């Protein structure tokens, strides 16, 4: 069971060029959350 997190954390060799993209993708929902706050601040929280 100790090898399972390692298998989930490493990409297969075929996908290694996409590693920077995979590192960025999980943060996109956080950016949408921040965008919602900026948008509401722009319209004065109607």
Swiss-Prot record:
Which residue ranges does UniProt annotate as crossing the membrane?
25-45
Question: Which Pfam families does the entry mention?
Answer: PsbK
Instruction: Name the InterPro entries on file.
Output: PSII_PsbK (IPR003687), PSII_PsbK_sf (IPR037270)
Propeptide stretches are 1-9
* Topology class, membrane: Single-pass membrane protein
Any idea where this protein resides? Plastid, Chloroplast thylakoid membrane
Assembly mode: PSII is composed of 1 copy each of membrane proteins PsbA, PsbB, PsbC, PsbD, PsbE, PsbF, PsbH, PsbI, PsbJ, PsbK, PsbL, PsbM, PsbT, PsbX, PsbY, PsbZ, Psb30/Ycf12, at least 3 peripheral proteins of the oxygen-evolving complex and a large number of cofactors. It forms dimeric complexes.
Quote the NCBIfam families the UniProt record gives: PRK02553.1 (NF002715)
Protein's job: One of the components of the core complex of photosystem II (PSII). PSII is a light-driven water:plastoquinone oxidoreductase that uses light energy to abstract electrons from H(2)O, generating O(2) and a proton gradient subsequently used for ATP formation. It consists of a core antenna complex that captures photons, and an electron transfer chain that converts photonic excitation into a charge separation.
- The protein here is known as Photosystem II reaction center protein K
The scientific name of the source species is: Nephroselmis olivacea (Green alga)
């Amino acid at each position: 069971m100790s090898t399972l997190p390692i298998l989930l954390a490493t990409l297969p060799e075929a996908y290694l060029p996409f590693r920077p993209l995979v590192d960025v993708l999980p943060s996109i929902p956080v950016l949408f959350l921040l965008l919602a706050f900026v948008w509401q601040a722009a319209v004065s929280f109607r």
